[in-house]
Amino acid sequence: MTLTTKHFDVEIPSIGFGTWQLKGDTATEAVKTALETGYRHIDTAQAYENEKAVGDGIQAAGSAREDFFLTTKVWTDQFKDGDLQSSTKESLKRLGVNEVDLLLLHWPNDDVPMEETIGALNDARKQGMTKNIGVSNFTKDQFDKAVELSDAPILVNQVEYHPFIDQTKLLAEAGHKGSALTAYCPLAQGRVFKNETIKMIAERYGVTPAQIVLRWFVQQPGVVAIPRSSNPEHIRQNFAIDEIHLDGDEMARISALRMHHDRIVDPDFAPVWDNPLAA
């Protein structure tokens, strides 16, 4: 069964397959395994330099195009009007598809006016390159501005989100605007496996810490998670969470870990992040 969250009449599979840092044959085999396992949401990006490999994995799995949700992201050096559309066409060629389901701006870029970039993103949608549009790594204020500037709904804000980071503000704002929040690094690059709270809950259910955390995500309204793995067994385990049902206390105990506010992805070009403690 594919768990989904619905936004602006669009059904987004709640567990997707992330492909960051997967390259070449490894990416191809991982995507093939994911689709054969039952994943119906694949996430890639121009900057990952694996769109061709991801497309090969899609083809190898033999999945009908209408049966899965495909996301890619435009890199910041392609944010000018014209550049964005041209680069998206190249992405489609590499992926071997006529359109993606979701096209995201990968990071905010203050060097190009947001009005221009959001306009170009909407134009790519009007030209049939993507069904939906969204953003990634946008702060609350940047997200609000993107929503205000866009003709089409901003379906998603994709951000770092795991049990050890406080994204309460972005979650609330996405919900207020009707958008989804997609979590990358949902397993905190393996840190969830070492946490005693998560390990204890996993032992109670007889499942992995990863499965517990992914279930924690899908039980939050409007949240999507995109775990990544090149290990076939882990790919299959991460998808097998239908039979897990966390109670309110377990959800709260995992959510309380956000007090650590431990951010993993913070490059030099990142925006000034929202302060979870500020009013």
Where are these regions (language model features)?
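CE4/NodB-like, metal-dependent polysaccharide N-deacetylase domain
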Residues: 84-104, 123-127, 149
